[in-house]
């Protein structure tokens, strides 16, 4: 199974560039010069192309992607059931929290779905209860990750297929090492999570803000990646602008004794970008969640049906996003 990109004016170099920088953006003094050497073009050509791709909206931002849990944050998926005439109001209020990264309206009784991350000293239930007190909220369900089977997919802009992503530089597992965050670490994280400027020496800006050299900045970033605190430093693409316009969350009701088997099988499908086990409630029976991105609703439905037949689970629903209220990286260690 595969799904392809919409017709796009991008040339082959643009597509190859997007393929590379969404997973292996170089941590070097002049990163665009280093990229240019791989393609036999000038540094200014790469800067121009990446600037153009950002302007077009294909690249959302370029920054460090951190592991929420390694930073001491608690995160969860949350489903709100909201009166239809209050959806916009509630969604806008939810968006004000810096720990809300993704927020969508979906076609279901639970019509607002968002991810929430709270800091080490914050209580998620207090934050959620405050949100749930908003006018129009009927009820909500907290759906934290009980087990992770897959996270992340690299969109193949050349061939139109999703592929399994690789860590920066080479395949490796994070080194097992305890990480106790310091105030200085927080300073680094605040800088590394910012969108990188598209200029010849972009890393000079965060380095100067931290009062250090770029070499020291790179050493710290690579150390974070080595121990798994930073997943990667990369360009983040917008799925819709890249041609994957159908955002479908497939939820499955899987027998408890086979959930690990099914979760691991789901993780092998290239169309599945994320796969998690989550809790169930009396009014929510689905315990396995998977995300797919396709070029149309019909294509997504066909993908789901084919996966269903292969894994032998027919009790599932696809919750399509009808509106995107917010999609951005969590702003770590920023005050509400």
Question: Which positions does each model-derived feature cover?
Answer:
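A compositional/biophysical signature of low hydrophobicity enriched in polar/charged and small residues
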Residues: 1-336
């Amino acid at each position: 199974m595969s799904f392809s990109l919409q017709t796009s004016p991008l040339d082959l170099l643009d597509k190859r560039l997007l393929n590379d920088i969404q997973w292996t953006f170089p941590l070097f003094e002049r990163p665009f010069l280093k990229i240019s050497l791989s393609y036999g073009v000038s540094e200014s050509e790469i800067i121009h192309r990446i600037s153009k791709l950002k302007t077009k909206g294909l690249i959302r931002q370029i920054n460090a992607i951190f592991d929420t849990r390694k930073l001491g944050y608690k995160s969860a998926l949350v489903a709100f059931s909201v009166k239809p005439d209050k959806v916009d109001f509630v969604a806008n209020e939810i968006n004000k929290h810096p720990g809300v990264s993704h927020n969508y309206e979906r076609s279901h009784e639970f019509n607002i779905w968002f991810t929430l991350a709270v800091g080490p000293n914050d209580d998620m239930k207090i934050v959620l209860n405050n949100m749930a007190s908003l006018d129009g909220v009927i009820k909500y369900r907290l759906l934290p990750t009980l087990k992770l089977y897959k996270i992340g997919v690299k969109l193949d802009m050349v061939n139109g297929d999703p592929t399994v992503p690789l860590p920066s530089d080479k395949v490796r597992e994070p080194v097992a090492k305890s990480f106790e965050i310091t105030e200085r670490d927080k300073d680094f994280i605040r800088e590394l999570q910012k969108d990188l400027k598209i200029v010849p020496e972009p890393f000079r800006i965060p380095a100067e803000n931290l009062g250090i050299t770029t070499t020291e900045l790179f050493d710290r970033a690579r150390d974070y990646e080595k121990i798994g605190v930073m997943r990667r430093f990369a360009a983040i693409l917008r799925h819709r602008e890249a041609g994957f316009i159908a955002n479908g969350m497939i939820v499955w009701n899987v027998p408890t004794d086979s959930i690990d088997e099914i979760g691991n099988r789901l993780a092998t499908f290239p169309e599945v970008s994320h796969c998690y086990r989550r809790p169930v409630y009396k009014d929510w029976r689905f315990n396995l969640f998977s995300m797919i991105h396709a070029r149309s609703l019909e294509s997504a439905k066909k993908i789901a049906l084919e996966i269903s037949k292969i894994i032998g689970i027919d009790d599932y629903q696809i919750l399509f996003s009808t509106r995107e209220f917010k999609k951005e990286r969590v702003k770590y260690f920023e005050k509400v």
